[in-house]
Amino acid sequence: MYDNLKNLGIQHPEDIDRYTLRQEANNDILKIYFRKDKGEFFAKSVKFKYPRQRKTISDTQSGQGFKEVNEINTNLRYVIEELDQICQQDQVEVDLKHKILDDLRHLEHVVANKIAEIEADLEKLTRR
């Protein structure tokens, strides 16, 4: 699993936290950030540079015949697919954690209101 990331020398893809991708001139720059260990101030990161692929395609709209376009490197596309799998999986886990915490807060509120209601009923009974 995650063969493309392992080919880049990333032995533990599960430690990846996030990534950024930007374009500089005719290159795409991929920066991968790893989770921080306790006591570390900065997250470890690695940077990779991919040249953009140049393709000549027919241009029927301008009537010129052909034009050159730059595209993302095919290998980089595969690496990004793997990174998205890892990073989106983390997002789903975070979303689930937030949902559970929200449900817990709501339950606390409902229970507190019910306790107050029961105490009020008890107070009415003791005043009689």
Swiss-Prot record:
<dbReference type="InterPro" id="IPR020911">
    <property type="entry name" value="UPF0325"/>
</dbReference>
<protein>
    <recommendedName>
        <fullName>UPF0325 protein PMI2289</fullName>
    </recommendedName>
</protein>
<comment type="similarity">
    <text>Belongs to the UPF0325 family.</text>
</comment>
<dbReference type="Pfam" id="PF11944">
    <property type="entry name" value="DUF3461"/>
</dbReference>
